Amino acid sequence: MRPLTPRQAEILELIKRNIAETGMPPTRAEIATRLGFKSANAAEEHLKALAKKGCIEIMPGTSRGIRLPVEEEDNSETGLPLIGQVAAGEPILAQEHVEQYYQVDPSMFHPSADFLLRVKGDSMKNIGILEGDLLAVHKVQQARNGQVVVARVDDDVTVKRFEKKGNLVYLHAENEDYSPIKVDLSFQSLTIEGLAVGVIRNGDWL
């Protein structure tokens, strides 16, 4: 691969991080906004340069028509990543959060799992999610009432049952010793990181 300019390297890293965080590449307008370009056309010129160097593939006719070529995918780790401590403001799937990889077939869960999260505490014990379990999580950004979610409230990550009423979100524990977490979206930050789709305990499928 031909060497990249610092700006091209910055854009390529942004594309990779956006795919890891949301499952999709950024639009030209999003790239321009995040990197301070005056217009989406400026971002387009950098994307064309990256495509010429073989770093990305551009699919015409769609705003998110950016794809990483197969040969650029990192195959040094396989399986599902186990996410450890999550840094404030960082995507949950950022490489620095990955403790290790488990050789688990994501398709064994429905919907398929994207990552694993180690359970801390007993707030969900009544539905069999226990301290030390590995929770299989399907990456989504929205949830329906009643679903068990991995949510980030401000900068704290928690596993709870989701309920939304207007501008208020309640994150319910499955343990009578815990009160619901109340989030007022008018001034608090809430991010849905994924849905709980299964549990691994002591190497067994539950």
From Swiss-Prot:
Where are the residues marked Cleavage as a site? 88-89
For this protein, the Enzyme Commission number is 3.4.21.88
* Annotated signal sequence range: none
According to the entry, DNA is bound by residues in 28-48
What GO biological process terms does the UniProt entry carry, in alphabetical order?
DNA repair; DNA replication; negative regulation of DNA-templated transcription; proteolysis; SOS response
**Pfam family, any one:** LexA_DNA_bind
Query: What are this entry's molecular-function GO terms?
Result: DNA binding; serine-type endopeptidase activity
SUPFAM superfamilies per the UniProt record, alphabetical: LexA/Signal peptidase, Winged helix' DNA-binding domain
Which residues are annotated as active site?
123 (for autocatalytic cleavage activity), 160 (for autocatalytic cleavage activity)
Keyword annotations from UniProtKB, A to Z: Autocatalytic cleavage, DNA damage, DNA repair, DNA replication, DNA-binding, Hydrolase, Repressor, SOS response, Transcription, Transcription regulation
Q: Which reaction does it catalyse?
A: Hydrolysis of Ala-|-Gly bond in repressor LexA
Family designation: Belongs to the peptidase S24 family.
Q: How does it assemble?
A: Homodimer.
The record's PANTHER family line, in alphabetical order, gives:
LEXA REPRESSOR, LEXA REPRESSOR-RELATED
Q: What does this protein do?
A: Represses a number of genes involved in the response to DNA damage (SOS response), including recA and lexA. In the presence of single-stranded DNA, RecA interacts with LexA causing an autocatalytic cleavage which disrupts the DNA-binding part of LexA, leading to derepression of the SOS regulon and eventually DNA repair.
Q: What's this protein's name?
A: LexA repressor
| Species of the source | Shewanella sp. (strain MR-7)
Gene name as annotated: lexA
